Amino acid sequence: MKDFIRYTKKRNLSLNTIRTYESVLKHYEPVLDSWIKIRNKIINSNFKPRTIHLHKNVLLSFFEFKKLKRYLQNLKLLKLPQIEMKYFDVISKNNLYKKTDILDDDSLEIKKYKTIIRFLFETGIRAHELFFLESINNRLYVLGKGNKKRQIFFVKQTFEQLQKFYENLKGFETTKTLRLYIKKIIGKNFTPHSLRRSFATFMLIKGANPKTVMLQMGHANIQTTFSYLNLNEQTNRRIYNKIMYQNDAE
């Protein structure tokens, strides 16, 4: 198990993701020698469907790393309870811009975190990727999962503002402080991942090419990108009504 955790660290995964992998694998460590025991532990668990699917994904990654083909195949075929549709909190561009406008009486810390929050929304990058930005010939690159470098598009004015604080960013080891400021500036229901989800929702609903959004976010496949599209129930109903109740010309 330790060699797998070392592998996840080399892949440049976030600290929170690595901790999740560790926690899940420790939960299954006593039964990892038997597929039947693993299956029974999954099936008989009292976790919510979303947590069970998370466990499945972690175990799939672990089995793939260990080249346990039979375990991998059996787990892929294992039927799990369906995940209920869940509406996550996202923030609109206009609302985010209002909340991150820098005011004259803002402290230096508030100015810094308002800039970071706006940059995360405008780029859709993962919070920990902030520490791996590289500017080359007016192009911006980030080191993402699996140590894969990708080019990202950005708003020049926001990035120039961010550069004023960038040396301070280098000292962060976790995004815990960032989480606290996001809740303070935007609202208690928001997290760094909410900004990433908000970016995807905004871009896709405005008609952006899904592949462009996929590449910007560093996703390996388009299905993952579409899973970030999050419209609340009211928005879904408004879109449905607009389409269904419009008068089509014959």
From Swiss-Prot:
Q: Which residues form the Core-binding (CB) domain?
A: 1-67
Q: Which GO terms describe its molecular function?
A: DNA binding
Please provide one cellular component term from the Gene Ontology annotations of this protein.
cytoplasm
Question: Pfam families attached here?
Answer: Phage_integrase
Q: Which UniProt keywords apply?
A: Cell cycle, Cell division, Chromosome partition, Cytoplasm, DNA integration, DNA recombination, DNA-binding
Q: Which Gene3D superfamilies match?
A: Intergrase catalytic core
Q: Where is the active site?
A: 126, 145, 193, 196, 219, 228
Its subcellular locations are: Cytoplasm
Q: Does the keyword Oxidoreductase apply?
A: no
InterPro entries in UniProt? CB, DNA_brk_join_enz, Integrase-like_cat_sf, Integrase_catalytic, Tyrosine_recombinase_XerCD
This protein's record includes keyword Endoplasmic reticulum: no
**A biological process from GO:** chromosome segregation
Per UniProt, residues of the Tyr recombinase domain are 83-241
Describe the function of this protein: Site-specific tyrosine recombinase, which acts by catalyzing the cutting and rejoining of the recombining DNA molecules.
Family membership noted in the UniProt record: Belongs to the 'phage' integrase family.
Official protein name in the record = Tyrosine recombinase UU222
